[in-house]
Structure formats: structure tokens, C-alpha cells
């Protein structure tokens, strides 16, 4: 599997434009100007990732905008943006539903859908080498 993908001026990564597979870009990163400048130098216009499982949008010069504060399609036409799409299976923002986005080239629309986290939690608990907390947190969306 490739570490990243591009389509025109859009970059797709799992984690960060700097380290596409491992680096966390947490909401508080927006208060570290050097870090954010380095990240935004790596993208042309829009980047999508989700390593932290915290859906929302990063801007070059503003604080992180959490998904739950965005109503309807959000325009991504002026400036650069990093969109964290959240998580399809293990959300960490207090909402147990899966999170994904629809991108039409001009706007990002965050969507949520129910999934059977109880079934997933049971499967996790059956794996003896995994801590029970990994399954229990699914019920809290954490």
C-alpha cells in the first residue's frame, strides 16, 4: 500500500503530510506555528488524514475546527486545509458513530453513521492479549 496518494492539488495520507503513516496531528498542534508551517508546506491545497480519529479541519492561521461545530458543507476553496476525516471504526471524539467525509472539490461534508460498536467491543474482549479498555472505550467514543 502506498504511504500517500495525490489527485491534483489534494493529498491523502493516513497520518500527517510530513510522516504519512505515523505522525499525529492533534488539535493543539495549531498552537505550534513551526510545526503547522512545516505541515502546510507539504500540501498544495487540501490534505486528508485521520490518524488521531478526531474529525475536524486544520487551517494555516486559525485554531482547529471540530467536526461537531461544522453544519453542512464547509467550503475549502481559499487557503490551505488539512481535514481529519475521523474514524470509521474507533471514533475518539465522544461520538460512537463512524465518521467520514464527502469531498466534491470545493466543500467538505462530514457524515456520521451508526455501526455496531458493541459487536466490535465483544471481539476485542475475546482477544486475551488486548486490554479490555480497548473494547470498553468504543461505548464512549474514546
Task: Specify the residue positions occupied by each region the protein language model found.
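Conserved catalytic scaffold of divalent metal-dependent phosphoesterases
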Residues: 1-48, 52-66
Amino acid at each position: 500500500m502506498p504511504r500517500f496518494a495525490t489527485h491534483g492539488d489534494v493529498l491523502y495520507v493516513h497520518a500527517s503530510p510530513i510522516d504519512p503513516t505515523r505522525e499525529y496531528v492533534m488539535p493543539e498542534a495549531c498552537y505550534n506555528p513551526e510545526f503547522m508551517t512545516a505541515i502546510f508546506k507539504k500540501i498544495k491545497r487540501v490534505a486528508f488524514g485521520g490518524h488521531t480519529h478526531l474529525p475536524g479541519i486544520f487551517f494555516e492561521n486559525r485554531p482547529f475546527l471540530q467536526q461537531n461545530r461544522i453544519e453542512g458543507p464547509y467550503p475549502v476553496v481559499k487557503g490551505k486545509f488539512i481535514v481529519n476525516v475521523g474514524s470509521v471504526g474507533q471514533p475518539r471524539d465522544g461520538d460512537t458513530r463512524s465518521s467520514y467525509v464527502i469531498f466534491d472539490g470545493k466543500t467538505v461534508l462530514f457524515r456520521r453513521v451508526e455501526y455496531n460498536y458493541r459487536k466490535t467491543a465483544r471481539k476485542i474482549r475475546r482477544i486475551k492479549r488486548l486490554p479490555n479498555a480497548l473494547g470498553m472505550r468504543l461505548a464512549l467514543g474514546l
